[in-house]
């Protein structure tokens, strides 16, 4: 007997140390439950219906399903008892006037024999006496297995999560009423409608998923009618919450604990108040209001009056109004003087550099004058002329470089070399000089030698012609006084080579958003500039100080994961790219908050016997996943010889222990062991040695309980 007892102790010790390393026994899923009231939404507790496929779209937009049609007579809606289309968003989203949101745990239990997690509740009433039913007057619905028992029958539930696909998973559901399951944002199970318990199965191996890749798993369930509520889930999907908002809701939007109107109101009507970004970490004890966002309201300028400024007015509760006149810029450094503001054109200026002896150019706030070189270039660059500008005479003028000598000898004529402009004199002979010319003060002596005898042919004195074709030169024959009267050109025109021509620069209004034109009649026209759109993906505007400005065309995003972009002038959408910081971290986009980061899960080659280990990249090696044996190994992963030996002695060491106990204590020993262990070994819940056979004959070792 002592030997047997010793053996028992040893075997029990072995059994204690042979731990089976496996998955968690229980997995908890945080779910959001939205309590509904039939008196607020008649889609809850309507007439009886049945299953109705096709009520929602096949692609999940955001974190909640959307209806497949806007037509209330859409057949799936009629069959599914859905009438209040505008209230459907409140089934799975918080709305303080339509529902009460609650957070609950859904605990799934592992069946070790199948490695399947399950949740089974024939009476699934998770929010009795809660939500709207805190008010006793709302507790008016009865049913369930105890038909007269009160229950909260009207609610919707959602779970948003992610999982790493292992390659073998399935998902099974049975229950009532509406159930929709999305994997990778695609509808894979549709049990919509108001119906008794219905079942459906999703085989993930048929969805085209890639092993070891992350996918979203979104589950939506509604209980809409008495008298029953059943939920049964069976799955081996290892779903988890990639991130939670600051309210503790998995992939939540922060609305559970933040109301922008109540928590974020800064009493400034000129700001747009919003709750913090959902994934913003908020230290415990801090108020959410400390992290609220307040964006200033931007007012657009009115198109019909460019001389006023609009802004947000606190006095009119945040309306955009005219708050002042436009302050036109000082353009003195450009030699421009403000003349006023035109409502259609904006600020108007005139140039200070318009004048007979001004070039029209401005240099650091000073107008450039016409000097000798400028006038020489304008009037012909004759080396025998002296060029200058005289404002009174209308601009540039040219006078002879070489004049008559001071001597009174009329026969001494000044000369100038045409190539170098060297002055000299030439003395005429008596024939050339004296032909009895009678001269007035505006004439000089000249004898025509082409005839014999020479005759007098007087010439105008040199000072009459100023060399400027834009002046009218007049000499008083009595006094000899010479005047140079500028030709009159109206408005913006200016004389050039004796003709009045339009000068565009004379119409410069200092506004780069106008096209300035000088007409032949001298009037200025300022036409608003139309910016030439050379790139259809650019939006062009005009700034009076810098002209046309092109900025990229803004294409709106759709949610947080679809980025708007412009292609050949057309707005399109593309997926937001989220970069992972390391090999062992996954970055992907969440519709609620944008890019998120969570730890990578490596899928082992043999999940029953191994665990996946992620190893980050180093300077010499890339990142990788490795499969590592459980330590200690699960029994089913032992070498074949060990397993065979165990089978021989009774499937497991624990069985051997029981067998010895049976030898020692017979049937009562077995019963005592079974009772003390709550029949925890499924393979040994009965012992054929001590059971009465169901067929013919008797078992001599069978002892009925006394």
From Swiss-Prot:
Disulfide bonds: none annotated. Residues 24-644 are extracellular. It is found in: Membrane. Residues 687-706 are annotated as: Disordered. GO terms for cellular component: extracellular region; membrane. It comes from Dictyostelium discoideum (Social amoeba). Its main location: membrane. Residues 1-23 form the signal peptide. Residues 693-706 have a biased composition (Polar residues). Residues 666-706 are cytoplasmic. This is Protein psiG. Pfam families: Dicty_CTDC (PF00526), PA14 (PF07691). InterPro entries: Fibro_Slime (IPR011874), PA14/GLEYA (IPR037524), PA14_dom (IPR011658), Prespore-cell_inducing_factor (IPR051154), S_mold_repeat (IPR001673). The chain crosses the membrane at residues 645-665. PANTHER family: PROTEIN PSIB-RELATED-RELATED (PTHR31137), PROTEIN PSIG (PTHR31137:SF2). Belongs to the prespore-cell-inducing factor family. It is a single-pass type I membrane protein. Glycans are attached at residues 95, 107, 212, 296, 429, 521, 532, 616. Keywords: Glycoprotein, Membrane, Signal, Transmembrane, Transmembrane helix. Residues 109-253 form the PA14 domain.
């Amino acid at each position: 007997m002592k030997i047997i007892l010793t053996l028992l102790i040893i075997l029990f010790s072995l059994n204690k140390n042979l731990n089976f390393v496996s998955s968690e026994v229980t997995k908890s899923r945080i779910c959001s439950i939205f309590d509904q009231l039939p008196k607020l939404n008649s889609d809850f507790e309507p007439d009886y219906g049945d299953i109705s496929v096709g009520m929602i779209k096949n692609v999940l937009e955001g974190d909640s399903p959307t209806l497949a049609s806007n037509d209330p007579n859409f057949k799936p809606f009629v069959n599914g008892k859905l009438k209040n289309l505008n209230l459907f968003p409140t089934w799975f989203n918080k709305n303080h006037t339509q529902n009460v949101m609650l957070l609950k745990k859904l605990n799934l239990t592992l069946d070790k024999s199948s490695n399947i997690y399950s949740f089974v509740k024939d009476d699934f009433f998770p929010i009795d006496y809660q939500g709207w039913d805190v008010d006793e007057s709302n507790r008016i619905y009865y049913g369930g297995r105890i038909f007269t028992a009160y229950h909260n029958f009207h609610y919707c539930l959602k779970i948003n999560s992610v999982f790493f696909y292992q390659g073998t998973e399935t998902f099974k559901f049975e229950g009532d009423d509406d159930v929709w399951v999305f994997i990778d944002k695609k509808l894979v199970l549709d049990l919509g409608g108001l119906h008794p318990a219905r079942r459906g199965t999703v085989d993930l191996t048929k969805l085209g998923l890639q092993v070891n890749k992350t996918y979203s798993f979104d589950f939506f369930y509604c209980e809409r009618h008495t008298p029953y509520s059943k939920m049964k889930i069976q799955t081996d999907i290892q779903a988890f919450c990639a991130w939670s908002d600051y309210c503790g809701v998995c992939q939540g939007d922060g609305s559970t604990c933040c109301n922008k109107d109540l928590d974020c109101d800064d009493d400034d009507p000129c700001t747009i108040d919003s709750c913090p970004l959902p994934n913003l970490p908020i230290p415990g004890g801090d108020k959410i209001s400390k992290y609220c966002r307040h964006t200033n309201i931007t007012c657009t300028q009115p198109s019909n009056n460019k001389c006023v400024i609009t802004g947000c007015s606190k006095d009119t509760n945040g309306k955009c109004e005219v708050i002042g006149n436009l302050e036109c810029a000082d353009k003195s450094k450009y030699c421009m003087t403000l003349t006023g503001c035109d409502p259609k054109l904006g600020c108007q200026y005139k140039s200070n550099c318009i004048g007979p002896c001004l070039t029209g150019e401005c240099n650091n706030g000073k107008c450039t004058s016409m000097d000798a070189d400028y006038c020489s270039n304008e009037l012909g660059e004759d080396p025998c002329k002296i060029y200058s500008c005289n404002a009174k005479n209308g601009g540039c003028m040219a006078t002879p470089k070489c004049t008559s000598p001071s001597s009174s000898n009329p026969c001494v004529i000044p000369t100038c070399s045409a190539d170098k402009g060297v002055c000299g004199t030439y003395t005429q002979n008596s024939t050339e000089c004296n032909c009895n010319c009678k001269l007035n003060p505006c004439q000089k002596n000249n004898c025509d030698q082409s005839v014999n005898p020479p005759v007098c042919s007087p010439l105008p004195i040199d000072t009459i012609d100023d060399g400027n074709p834009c002046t009218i030169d007049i000499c008083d024959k009595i006094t000899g006084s010479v005047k140079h009267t500028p030709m009159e050109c109206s408005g913006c025109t200016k004389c050039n080579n004796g003709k009045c021509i339009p000068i565009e620069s004379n119409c410069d209004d200092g506004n780069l958003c106008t096209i300035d034109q000088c007409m032949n009649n001298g009037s200025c026209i300022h036409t608003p500039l139309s910016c030439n759109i050379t790139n259809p993906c650019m939006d062009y505007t005009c700034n009076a100080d810098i002209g046309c400005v092109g900025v990229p065309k803004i294409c709106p995003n759709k949610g947080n994961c679809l980025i708007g972009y412009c292609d050949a002038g057309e707005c399109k959408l593309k997926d937001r790219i989220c970069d992972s910081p390391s090999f062992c971290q996954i970055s992907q986009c969440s519709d609620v908050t944008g890019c998120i980061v969570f730890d990578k899960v490596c899928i082992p080659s043999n999940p029953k016997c191994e665990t996946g280990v992620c190893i980050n990249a180093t300077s010499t090696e890339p990142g990788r996943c490795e499969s590592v044996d459980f330590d200690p190994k699960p029994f089913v992963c032992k070498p074949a010889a060990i397993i065979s030996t165990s089978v021989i002695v009774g499937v497991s060491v624990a069985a051997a222990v029981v067998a010895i106990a049976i030898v020692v204590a017979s049937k009562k020993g077995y019963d005592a062991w079974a009772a003390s262990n709550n029949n925890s070994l499924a393979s040994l819940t009965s012992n054929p040695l001590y059971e009465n056979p169901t067929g013919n004959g008797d078992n001599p070792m069978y002892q009925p309980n006394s």
